[in-house]
Amino acid sequence: RVCDRIASNPGMPCFTEALDATLSELASRSSMLYRLVFSNLWLTRPLVAKIMASNGETAAMLRTTYALTQLEGSPAHNVLPPAARANFNVRVAPFETVDDAVARARALAVEECLASGVSPDHVTVEIAQAVPYTEPAPISPFENDAAFDYLHRCVSGVYPEAGFAPYVQNSCTDSREFNAICEHVYRFCGFEYSAEARALIHAENERIGVDVYKRGIGFYVAFLANLGQLS
């Protein structure tokens, strides 16, 4: 019951400037109905938040999420466990910290224990020491920014049909190692991924098409060849 309480109560939704910019770009490329919704966030934020919360990928752009990934109890089917353990994968929103996420989980655990008549002392919520973690990366500059505009030009040169907007990357990447030395860290992949291709990332038979690969290489060639424009 504690696990269900935590998983069912993610953080409060918050629209960052980056998310607003993403939705603004979507508005310009959507049908009339979605254009009206995304162009009037001052009115439709509650509706948009509800829609985004219903999808795992977009929910993590909006707020801190908790996904139950492991349960551990008895080592045998006929043995009562002296203790049980659960692990959550937590995606911390850019406007919160790891401590915020842990504190929320602890508070929810206490609430459920008290509601169930169980002493909160029987439940411990802590960060798994064996798993490295980092704070959410800062949002890189994107408004009237030379580096972001350069990336935009490179993308448009290879993918003229594509829209371009900042995006909240909700998974951990090695790019976080550069945050200490540079504020312009953009988590961008120059290859075109369909929903099907994204589902294959880190999965069995992960792959991309040959044409997708060739076009993606063209982006990186253009990106490196014109870096002098930033000097």
Locate each region found by the language model.
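Basic phosphate/pyrophosphate-binding loop/patch that engages nucleotide-derived ligands
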Residues: 1
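An extended, acidic, His-containing surface patch that forms the Zn2+-binding/catalytic region
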Residues: 4, 11-75, 82, 94, ...
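Hydrophobic core residues within well-ordered beta-strands of beta-rich domains
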Residues: 84-86
